[in-house]
C-alpha cells in the first residue's frame, strides 16, 4: 500500500548518515543491508524502496545541503512536536491528507479557544543561523501544485512549531517528492 511504501522510505531516510553517505544507488543498498542485518530495518520494507530514488535525493541540491548540515551536526530528523494554536485557525485533519498530523480533538483534547496540533517533522537543518524545513513524500502525484495544495497547511503548522520551539526563523520550506525525483519549494 501507499502508506507502507511511505513508511519504508521514511524509516530508511531516518537512519542514513547524510554526512558520509555517497549519493549512489550501491551506497544506499549497502546501508540498507547493514540496517537489515542489525535488525533496525526489514527486508520487507526495503522491497518497497527504490534505492536509486534515494540516491537521487541525496545528490540533489537539497540533499547536498542536508549533508553539509549533517557534517556540522545541524541536521535533525523525525522530530515530534506539539503546537498550540487558536481554534479559529485550525483545519480538519481530513483536509491535511497526512497521518503524521492530528488535531487535538483526535489526539490530546481541546479548549474553547486553543487546540493542540501534534506531528513529526521529517527533517530540518540549520543553515546560516536559520532553519530549512523539509518533508519527504512518496505520493504518486505528478504536478508540483498538487503537492503544494495537499501539504501546504501541514507544513505551515510544522513551520510554526519549529519557530516556536527554536526561536529561529524558518527561511525555506521544501517537499522532496520521490515520485517526481525533485524538491518542491513551498
Sequence positions of predicted segments:
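Structural signature of nuclease core domains in nucleic-acid processing machines
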Residues: 1-186
Amino acid at each position: 500500500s501507499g502508506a507502507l511504501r511511505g513508511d519504508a522510505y521514511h524509516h530508511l531516510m531516518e537512519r542514513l548518515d547524510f554526512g558520509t553517505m555517497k549519493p549512489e544507488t550501491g551506497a544506499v543498498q549497502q546501508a540498507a543491508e547493514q540496517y537489515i542485518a542489525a535488525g533496525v530495518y526489514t527486508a520487507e520494507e526495503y522491497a518497497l524502496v527504490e534505492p536509486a530514488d534515494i540516491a537521487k535525493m541525496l545528490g540533489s541540491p537539497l540533499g547536498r545541503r542536508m549533508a553539509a548540515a549533517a557534517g556540522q551536526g545541524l541536521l535533525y530528523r523525525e522530530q515530534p512536536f506539539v503546537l498550540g494554536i487558536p481554534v479559529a485557525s485550525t483545519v480538519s485533519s481530513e483536509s491535511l491528507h497526512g497521518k503524521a498530523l492530528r488535531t487535538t480533538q483526535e489526539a490530546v483534547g481541546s479548549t474553547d479557544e486553543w487546540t493542540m496540533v501534534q506531528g513529526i517533522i521529517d527533517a530540518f537543518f540549520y543553515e546560516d543561523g536559520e532553519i530549512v524545513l523539509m518533508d519527504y513524500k512518496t505520493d504518486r502525484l505528478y504536478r508540483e501544485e498538487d503537492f503544494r495544495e495537499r501539504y501546504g497547511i501541514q507544513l505551515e503548522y510544522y513551520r510554526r512549531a519549529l519557530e516556536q520551539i527554536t526561536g529561529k526563523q524558518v527561511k525555506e520550506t521544501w517537499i522532496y517528492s520521490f515520485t517526481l525525483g525533485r524538491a518542491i519549494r513551498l
